């Protein structure tokens, strides 16, 4: 069985590499004429870091409405009402 890293591990690794890339950018001299994008700003359309479990909640979210529809369908066909 394959091992899947936890969201905390992935988040820590992401922050580690972001910090190391920012420190390498800050170590450049002012004579270097390279433009860098500020990675500390959240990207538009992506969830915030505080909401790091959004995918987990949406993936495992169960809809109670669907189960109610199934029960209504079964009762309409007579399968749930007993032996007729």
Curated annotation (Swiss-Prot):
Q: Which Cys pairs does UniProt list as disulfide-bonded?
A: none
Stretches of the chain forming a coiled coil according to its record = none
Which Pfam family, any one of them, does this sequence belong to? PPDFL
Q: Mind telling me which InterPro entries this protein's record contains? A: PPDPF
PANTHER family according to UniProt: PANCREATIC PROGENITOR CELL DIFFERENTIATION AND PROLIFERATION FACTOR (PTHR14572)
Q: Which domain of life is it from?
A: Eukaryota
Q: Which family does it belong to?
A: Belongs to the PPDPF family.
Task: Report the record's Gene Ontology biological process terms.
Answer: cell differentiation
The name of this protein is Pancreatic progenitor cell differentiation and proliferation factor-like protein
């Amino acid at each position: 069985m394959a091992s899947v890293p936890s969201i905390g591990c992935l988040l820590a690794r992401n922050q580690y590499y972001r910090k190391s890339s920012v420190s390498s950018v800050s170590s450049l001299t002012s004579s270097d004429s390279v433009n860098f994008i500020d990675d500390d700003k959240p990207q538009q359309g992506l969830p915030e870091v505080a909401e790091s479990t959004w995918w987990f909640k949406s993936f495992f979210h169960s809809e109670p409405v669907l189960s109610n529809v199934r029960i209504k369908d079964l009762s309409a066909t007579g399968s749930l009402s007993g032996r007729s």
